[in-house]
Amino acid sequence: DRTKEPGSLGEPLYQDVCTAFQEKGGYTPNIVGGRYGLGSKDFTPAMVKAVYDNLLGMQPKNHFTVGIEDDVTNTSLEIGPSFSTVPEGTISCLFYGIGSDGTVGANKQAIKIIGDNTDLYAQAYFAYDSKKSGGFTASHLRFGKSPIKSCYLIQSADYVACHKAAYVTQYDLLRGIKDGGTFVLNCNWDLKALEENLPASMKNTIARKHLKFFTIDAVDVAQNVGLGGRINMVMQTAFFKLADVIPFDKAVALLKESIKKTYGSKGDKIVNMNIAAVDQAVSALHEVSYPASWADTTEGAVVRHDSDPDYIANVVRPILAQNGGDLPVSAMSPDGTMPNGTTSFEKRGVAIMLPEWNPETCVQCCQCTFVCPHAAIRPVVAQPDELEGAPESFVTIDAKGKELKGMKFRIQVYPEDCLGCGSCANVCISKEKSLVMKPLETQMADQKANLAFAEANISVKSQLMDRFSLKGSQLQQPLLEFSGACAGCGETPYVKVLTQLFGERMVVANATGCSSIWGASSPTSPYTVNEDGFGPSWGNSLFEDAAEYGFGIMSGIKQRRAKLADLVTKALATEGVEGELKDALQGWLDNKDDAEASRSYGEKVMANLETLDEIDCPLADQIYDMADLFTKKSCWIFGGDGWAYDIGYGGLDHVLASGEDINVLVLDTEVYSNTGGQASKATPLGAIAQFAMAGKRTGKKDLGRMAMTYGYVYVASICMGADKNQVLKAFKEAEAYKGPSLIIAYAPCINQGIRKGMGKSMEEGKLAVQAGYWMLYRFNPELAKEGKNPFQLDSKEPTGDLNEFLSGENRYASL
């Protein structure tokens, strides 16, 4: 069976077979059941053999598992050496790419070209990690004259192409490559740089297996023709040149024809750029004449992780290296929880360009850090004595603002965590840009040293400015960092800023969707903690029940805090409770619904709690056990428009109608982003999306106006690119409102086909508001109590050109 039925006597197929023999009567053979392939596990010939070996045993193991190492319940079968059943003469090719570079799409084109224009059989499998654009992808392609029935990934390749240079130290790219095979690396390194940047083990394999080794600077070619980071056609041309599956001239002609079919709807400009990339690819391909000494060298790039905590070393690193399938069951957490802040260990290094800060023109507005989707650029405020021993490249300027008088300021990039989207540079308001995107190799060394110094020597100055001001919010540590979201993502900036405002006391129920995938994909979590160990608690149930899930969490916290208040009341009535403890207990009871006061009084209670022990009060232990509830929790439900407008609307409506104090943030991309861009009720009239390829024929559901009809729900419509201060006001008011709050955030998305690129997502949001496409407003029931109109329209009368805005997005322009 390829399923697990918890609580059953056996899996479905096993039970069906047992039942069939039992009902037939007569002779019944020994029936053995087991499980394979769970969690996308590969099912290889060696595993099949292990099943037969088990059946040949004197006492075959029943209810076995194959493909995992179960050292907890000991159900697994021992697997022997791997072997291949691929027909002789089959060519196996492996392509390692990065999400959104076009590698997977190009390989699908290649399979189609070869399958349609040769007598070869073709097969393709594609493996991805759970990150969005910028994540790891592996394409497994096989071609041969015999039918290919190998339903498993390639274990021994003739051709390996690595489309991202950073991968050479992150993955074992050449594992299983055949003697005399071909290896193609996308990089701009000459032989000297290859000596320095390739690990010794990779050089050993190249030389010992006599590989044909080629390099190509595909990024340079793609940028020269205007494709940016889309290197797929360059690398595909190199593949057809080297693999010799089809005569090269014929392959080029077929590739160009495929380009016209694939990109024709996006206009002649895109088609011509891709054709130019094909034409320039071969001249950029260079064979490397490597020395024979590589076979035994011990010198090369080394990445050390000596100081990693156990969970990182034993679970995270193997999974990140694509070796998670080798982990035993005992390595996993029994309850499904995982530590926070683990994305900081990834250091993916996938950016092509990094922002370079110009201190001479910087006005210290911090808008660049405010909009960063990955919290990979931050302000640093330092006391002069904290700068002793700083690297020469660690340039600072006098900090502006009376609160920062006498201090120094700089903008610091996290070079290995940045995705290079350019959002920070594009929103810079300086007349002469204070951030300019520069090639990775010109920035990496200095910025790594600068970051290491800042983290080791300079404290976070979170108490100096009002956290609800734009600049003040950016002096708070972001408690969402380095997520797996797309470069330029429109969703994560909202959540990141939210964690800077309330993160140390947030509890989040997340609907399944983009925000749950970039929010907590095993094995790493981008939600982190501050220096005191406080940060968001995060959980995900299902797609459809996030509102109910969050409502249940909120109700549980409410009930438990009521119990704590009861204990505090009883403690106050206890003889002998006086002085600082009594003041602290009474102060907390009077201010338990005030976030800052409840935290402060709670700390005072804990500091004096031993007084209860001294007077033999039995309440001390009970209060201590509930200490995490002293600070008022900020309960949030996160989800996309697919959840809020469609799948989970019934639950959302129930929660909003309840009148309870809970906050909802809807990240509105106007499509089901996580599953590839299907139309939702948030998709506007005329927008092209999956299931609406001729343009959606109905209008957008007005979720905000529907919620306002209750009269007691706080509702806000926000757009970070258009008005950052309005975003802060809405977040502050919604969290402070003693009742249900709904915030609908416009989130530009890669599925919208923004023609300027995702680095201009903030500009796109601004254009949407200026054109009247998206409105900014706040509906605050508290104003009605004062006799005022609760509705405030924050966006101005449209001044932009709606047609110009629509023409800038493929979802409309293609229509």
Question: What kind of region is each of these model predictions?
Answer:
Residues 2-4, 125-164, 268, 278, ...:
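A structural-propensity feature for long, helix-poor, extended segments
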Residues 6-12, 42-47, 105-109, 134-138, ...:
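Short acidic, glycine/serine/threonine-rich loops at helix termini
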Residues 1-2, 7, 11, 15, ...:
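Active-site cofactor/cluster-binding pocket
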Residues 1-63, 80-83, 87-179, 182-232, 491-507, ...:
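Thiamine diphosphate
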Residues 31-33, 64-66, 122-126, 162-163, ...:
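General beta-strand structural signal in soluble alpha/beta enzymes
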Residues 85, 206-215, 255, 463-477:
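Active-site-adjacent bridging/hinge elements
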Residues 251, 264-417, 425-507, 512-635, ...:
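Ferredoxin-type iron-sulfur electron-transfer modules and their immediate structural context
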